[in-house]
Structure formats: C-alpha cells, structure tokens
Amino acid sequence: GSSIDNRMWKRGSGTWPFKCERVFIQHNRLMNAHGPQDSYSAHIDYGCKDVVIQYNLSFNNEGGFAEVLGDNVNCGFRYNISINDGYREDPDGLQWNKKGKIFWVSTFCGGPTRCPSEGTFFYNNTIYVDSTLNPEIYVWPESGDVHILNNLVYMESSGEILESYLETQD
C-alpha cells in the first residue's frame, strides 16, 4: 500500500484479477506488499472463472500469500513458493479479521450479500515460515467447494503452531 496518493487505501496486492475469465498468472516475483488490508502476494477478487496463479515466487507480503474472494468458479493457486508471507498482526486481536494468512478464502463479493465459490483450490505450493511469524489458514463459513491439498508448509522449530480456521454454520 502507499500513502503517496489519497486515492490509495494503504493496501494492495502484487496482482488481483477481477471479474476475469481464463487467466494464468505465472513466473512472477510478488513481494513486499504492505498495508492494513489485503496486501497479499496475489488475490483472486470476486466474479472470476478459471483463474490460475502458478509458478510464482512470493515473499514478505504483510497480508499473506493467497487470498480468494467469493463468487468464483475453478480458481486457485498451485506450484508457487511463499517465503515469510502473512506477518501482519491484527490490531483488534481478532483471529480472522486482519491477521496475516497463508491461505484465506472469503465469501465477499462486493456487497452485504455473501457468495460462495465453486472449485477453489490450493495445491502443490511450498510455504516457508520463519520462527518470528505465525500466519493463519482461514476459510470463511459457507465458502463453497474449497480444496487445500498436498501443500508443503515448513515452519522453523521455534515458530508457533499454525492456526487453521475452517468454520461451518450451525
């Protein structure tokens, strides 16, 4: 994020497709995004179909590594490397609010109505977290069809246990 221009909200991610179809984002270095919201290496905004983020190097992004919003179909992250992403601590102390995350899936789709996605995926990514960080994995309730498979997450020995929140509605 930046405060150079007052139209910037002190947030931003390396890239974020929005209402796109059939997009591949690959072979990039996504680094140093900083701010109190978003600030991921990349995030898939709402209204996308068949968006794949693959073969990228991500590091030092305050918000986290991979974010997927609602109302998407067959979108996700595969074959990426993440190093020390998700170092933000939530100022309100809420576990899921603004704290840094490795993977985050939400149902936000532009307004108060929440929208699940179909076929969200995170697979074959390699994630390194040093001992000073404790990012989360968080999937909002009713996020739809989400697959988190075969990812390698390495945390240095003195790091905290990785918190994961996969909630269901009662």
Which residue stretches match the model-derived regions?
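Glycine- and acidic/polar-rich repeat regions and solenoidal domains
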Residues: 1-170
